[in-house]
Regions:
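Conserved "repeat-terminator" motif of extracellular CCP/Sushi domains
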Residues: 1-15, 82-115, 168-203
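Small-residue (G/S/T/A) turn/hinge positions that recur once per unit in extracellular repeat modules
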Residues: 17-26
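Short, acidic Ser/Thr/Gly-rich low-complexity loop/linker segments typical of extracellular
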Residues: 24, 124-135
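Solvent-exposed, conformationally flexible loop/turn segments
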Residues: 26-41, 48-56, 93-95, 133-144, ...
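Surface-exposed receptor/substrate recognition regions of extracellular proteins
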Residues: 39-42, 68, 108-110, 178
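Surface-exposed interfaces of beta-sheet-rich extracellular modules
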Residues: 53-85, 140-174, 198, 203
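Proline-threonine-serine-rich low-complexity tracts
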Residues: 108-111, 116-118, 141-147
Length: 203
């Protein structure tokens, strides 16, 4: 650009972790920190004006990977910027590297539902026990606690029959972030007809 490098600074943009997000496109830019005066005929530099701090323009493309979001820019001296606009308002006289940090998403929807089947095969959901959340963390298991093998519902004793989605992890599709827990009535037993035996009565 016909300007000596010693009168310019470089802004560089990188990702802290390419597995979480990338910084691509224009990842560096040059800024001139001196006003330069030249001879009108020879073009030689005749005088330098005072140094003027320069603003980064952040021309790069920042792309989070699935399950992550952009969190902040970090400047060399551990100054942080929460957005491109904040970064662009900063100014420097020396080379700088800006590091894009990404964090896992914690705003994902998931649901856990509990169903109870009586002796007649009628299935009823315990809506009061349902868990509906919009603060799911990407990649974490939906079921984080052990499901009890026995449960009481409407004054009756039930035994755990099956769990649909027991090992599911929270993903990006809310329709897939569902776990259904099924209990079956257990009011009678093989040894004592009046005592539950952890075997569904329908069997």
């Amino acid at each position: 650009d016909d300007i000596p490098d010693k009168y310019q600074i470089t802004f560089t943009y990188v990702s802290a972790d390419d597995d979480k997000g990338t910084v691509t496109g224009t990842t560096s830019e040059i800024a001139t920190v001196y006003e330069i005066f030249r001879d009108s005929e020879t073009g030689e530099i005749t005088e330098l004006g005072p140094q003027t701090p320069q603003h980064p323009t952040q021309p790069s493309t920042v792309t989070p990977k699935d399950g992550y979001r952009f969190e902040k820019w970090q400047q060399d001296d551990l100054t942080f910027f929460n957005s491109d606009d904040e970064l662009r308002n900063s100014e420097y006289l020396e080379d700088q590297t800006f590091i894009a940090h990404f964090t896992v998403r914690r705003d994902l929807h998931y649901e856990i539902h509990y169903f109870y089947e009586d002796a007649n095969g009628v299935v009823t959901e315990d809506t009061a026990a349902a868990i509906v959340s919009d603060i799911g963390v990407f990649g974490e298991k939906i079921l984080t606690t052990t499901v009890p093998k026995e449960s009481e519902f409407n004054g009756k004793h039930y035994v755990l029959e099956r769990i649909e989605g027991a090992d599911k992890q929270i993903g990006l599709d809310p329709k897939e972030n569902m776990v259904n827990v099924y209990y079956s009535m257990d009011e009678i037993g093989e040894i004592d007809p009046d005592e539950p035996d952890n075997i569904p009565d329908k069997y």
